[in-house]
Amino acid sequence: MLKCPERVSVKKKEDIPDLPNLIEIQIKSYKQFLQIGKLAEERENIGLEEVFREIFPIKSYNEATVLEYLSYNLGVPKYSPEECIRRGITYSVTLKVRFRLTDETGIKEEEVYMGTIPLMTDKGTFIINGAERVVVSQVHRSPGINFEQEKHSKGNILFSFRIIPYRGSWLEAIFDINDLIYIHIDRKKRRRKILAITFIRALGYSSDADIIEEFFTIGESSLRSEKDFALLVGRILADNIIDEASSLVYGKAGEKLSTAMLKRMLDAGIASVKIAVDADENHPIIKMLAKDPTDSYEAALKDFYRRLRPGEPATLANARSTIMRLFFDPKRYNLGRVGRYKLNRKLGFSIDDEALSQVTLRKEDVIGALKYLIRLKMGDEKACVDDIDHLANRRVRSVGELIQNQCRSGLARMEKIVRERMNLFDFSSDTLTPGKVVSAKGLASVLKDFFGRSQLSQFMDQTNPVAELTHKRRLSALGPGGLNRERAGFEVRDVHASHYGRICPIETPEGPNIGLITSLSSFAKINEFGFIETPYRIVRDGIVTDEIEYMTADVEEECVIAQASASLDEYNMFTEPVCWVRYAGEAFEADTSTVTHMDVSPKQLVSIVTGLIPFLEHDDANRALMGSNMQRQAVPLLKTEAPVVGTGLECRAAKDSGAIVVAEEDGVVDFVDGYKVVVAAKHNPTIKRTYHLKKFLRSNSGTCINQQPLCAVGDVITKGDVIADGPATDRGELALGKNVLVAFMPWYGYNFEDAIIISEKLIREDAYTSIYIEEFELTARDTKLGKEEITRDIPNVSDEVLANLGEDGIIRIGAEVKPGDILVGKITPKSETELAPEERLLRAIFGEKAADVKDASLTVPPGTEGVVMDVKVFSRKDRLSKSDDELVEEAVHLKDLQKGYKNQVATLKTEYREKLGALLLNEKAPAAIIHRRTAEIVVHEGLLFDQETIERIEQEDLVDLLMPNCEMYEVLKGLLSDYETALQRLEINYKTEVEHIREGDADLDHGVIRQVKVYVASKRKLQVGDKMAGRHGNKGVVSKIVPEADMPYLSNGETVQMILNPLGVPSRMNLGQVLETHLGYAAKTAGIYVKTPVFEGFPEQRIWDMMIEQGLPEDGKSFLYDGKTGERFDNKVVIGYIYMLKLSHLIADKIHARSIGPYSLVTQQPLGGKAQMGGQRFGEMEVWALEAYGVAHMLQEILTVKSDDVSGRTRIYESIVKGENLLRSGTPESFNVLIKEMQGLGLDVRPMVVDA
């Protein structure tokens, strides 16, 4: 069995822990959303279940009818993912929901069909209308509370806070220049500000005394004589002081005590007063109490309502319901668990499960936030403003959450429809059932819209396995509820200290999206709240343990973290007394005794693709960014070759991308061919697992997906072994390019400006040859004029043109085609307008339906040539039009199918019985198993399981068995669930096959009779103009393909395969390519593969030692000889092996010339671009160039008849036909457009003919 090569490394110890599953971010999130495989009562209140529980129950307006949600049930997919791609349909499951409706007639339960939900494939993708798509995770501002500061024009710093809910109105509070705090509700209504004290009163703190008690420490001071005045003058009263007998007010809460007031109180016999110990007259709360226009809860509510809804009558009931709706109704205001967690953590409240379940706002939250804001204002060192770009304040919405939000909006729409239907239903004539009120359209339409149109649902980049993997790990700050690329500033795009180990600082696109679209770091995970976590090893008493702790960005700020490269002895203790650490976002040297944690690996900083760049630490960051992005554009080659110099991530990247086939259990290979591998299970050789290989499929980007087996019959394999290679992989390792012998030298000026010179030998050996597959589709429809027909009888076409078409009008597989060739012959009825007048008259008289047809065949577009590799035909079958022979054949086919289905069911039952026996036979029942419906005890506690009991369990449905939680029963539940799913899948497959035999492809679009897809494969060799690149951002275009004999050669006669410009290294500062060249030369000579992981690779000294061991020059430079003259070049040249990739920017796809094509309607100029068969733009600067030469006639031609002179175009055509050499140009259409535009501005411009 072919296994990936052992790579030599200088790294002493492997990483702890191993990398997590790289597409977990997608799979885990969607699994939690759907909770497939869980029983209804076992489902947690998350995902789809949470949405249903939130929206239901729905009550009618008079509350006489109630619709309750009970549970949902997901079906089994009708087709496999591969079949869905082939048919161009969506890979989905049906969603059925059980509702209970209660009205005056009684209680009715019913299961209602709610449409379909797309299902995620094992690779973390969705198949929508036959195309693989990925839902990109979105990074957005976390719900919760943020404290900010801004500078006023007068120089004062104004502090503010925002409480951002997951859903609902934002609440903002900001200090003004007079130290008063104003509340704003929703940013849109910013001008409607409410004094904070008024808002607090409206929340229920009606008296001034209540408010003072919330914000200050209350103390009681005695008032016996005038000696006590000194202590009390200037203090703030905490409560109203009223003489109960006379109702005389001596002082109000919030007032400053004066000598006169104290004298009056002393005279009235008041013995003590309550004061606010830590308050003074300049305190914001005291200032606001003085400014507050209201003095009671009712007045505050009305004032709040008046400011929020000016012009509407401010009644108490209206005001109360408004404030309740805004902040205290869970349907309209929801902080979410995340928002509550952030808010409680910031304000010092509890973060246990009970506290986190409170999703609406509380009075205590507003009071706590205002207290914190005042502490900020007062300069409290423990209070600090938040950094909104810190990852503690940004969270990730993964696929499950994004779709959950869509489902919520769809069901909210449905809620209105349900209420309307309940209201309008006529109970006298019919009985109301759940099916009559529930509409499935709302949910289906939002899901269809999201997967088809959302900015976050993207057509998967499938150029190579790395592109696919990175696309699933991508994080976007764009999309609904996110940022806008035009308005996003530098701060949000920049690398932040909290990104360490969470978001890759290197991999991001160049251009307008820089920093907004990023990638998850290698070890990063997303926690239950959506925050990105990264792992650290725990350090205890100076010893680095193997215990791992995943930490979010805010928790990490409190820890002292050492680098992964810090040196340790054999006891995992630091060898040095000081080391570099990170603490609170800063890096510095510190004593090792203070260290609490340590990085798990140096590569936890970067993403997977960046981690594939060897010697990354020697490259400039800008070039590393280009290197990361260009690896995703590498085209899978015909002959793959793993890099000699790798980083050790190649195996893992290939495995998790889903490109290769990995063994799911131990066993022995029983059968192998190009299409499948059959493995007999180790524990029971009669149980066989078949791995189907993908053969010559077209990827989203037109490249070829092909898997080849790596094992032979009799090979022993263990779980996790690679049993088949895929595109761009070599023995289970990623192989995007080729190891090429390069020389860094100028050569006759051909490698000017990064151009690349390659040897003809690479072309001859098909080193950089790739296969592209193009899909062409044609449909025959039933039109108003008659049916379209796919046929070989095409009018006015010669037999030579039809030579490759079969009897049915479809091209044969294996035919070589070039532009213009017919792939599928089709004729379509001509419409009346296309007929001559006399023909139309005859038709009108004789009433004959259009008999004349026109050619509507599918032809090969310009620029495409290749071999027809596959043809797929989909058609509907009409039972009435079938012949007797066809019906007999169908019956035989159905009989065979039924027999096969019965055998499969029998095999499955046997397999299941064996597993049940192995688990239960002669084991003691840990607890009783009860039948849910009949309440009968199926298995008594302590009973020994015998064959009869096992058979009884086997016959029952899992839903009907009530089992207590214990280890044995958990395994039993899993077995039962797997068996029922497998049985269901077999039944669906059988029914689908039967349907296909009887009715053909019933899922074709309406009106389509037949659909034909033709796949043309073309071999693309490397040619001049193709773009190539290394892994260090060293890109260039092939400028010349040189005969092998003319290439420079070494003293041993070996020719160089590629020549690169040495000037591409110093200014680009990507020295990684030079080190790779040297190490590649040494490793290739030694016949070994090496890995040089990011930040812990081969030191230079080790590379020189390796080169000396292999007898290579120590400086990596050799004398070369000119292939043309045989003379030696004057100076030594750096030569070695470098891994070069061919990128998907092929010249064959870009080169274009227009012969005939469309014109723009307004300007009458040819359109632009290859897709429109457009012309080349001859712009202003090009006109200057011709003017400089003085070529008047050429200029006149280009600006008139070759462009937009409509009459002149016709005349020049006539001249060419007649053989005249004459140019009579007219007025360019663009001149007329200019005049019309000026007239549109109200200027009276008219061209006038003036006699010469």
Swiss-Prot record:
Catalytic activity entry: RNA(n) + a ribonucleoside 5'-triphosphate = RNA(n+1) + diphosphate
Signal peptide: none
GO cellular component: DNA-directed RNA polymerase complex
Highest taxon, organism lineage: Bacteria
Protein keywords: DNA-directed RNA polymerase, Nucleotidyltransferase, Transcription, Transferase
Pfam families: RNA_pol_Rpb2_1 (PF04563), RNA_pol_Rpb2_2 (PF04561), RNA_pol_Rpb2_3 (PF04565), RNA_pol_Rpb2_45 (PF10385), RNA_pol_Rpb2_6 (PF00562), RNA_pol_Rpb2_7 (PF04560)
One of the record's GO molecular function terms: DNA-directed RNA polymerase activity
A biological process from GO: DNA-templated transcription
The EC number(s) this enzyme carries: 2.7.7.6
Similarity field: Belongs to the RNA polymerase beta chain family.
Subunit and interaction comment: The RNAP catalytic core consists of 2 alpha, 1 beta, 1 beta' and 1 omega subunit. When a sigma factor is associated with the core the holoenzyme is formed, which can initiate transcription.
NCBIfam families: PRK00405.1, rpoB
Physiological role: DNA-dependent RNA polymerase catalyzes the transcription of DNA into RNA using the four ribonucleoside triphosphates as substrates.
Name of the protein in question: DNA-directed RNA polymerase subunit beta
Organism, as annotated: Chlamydia pneumoniae
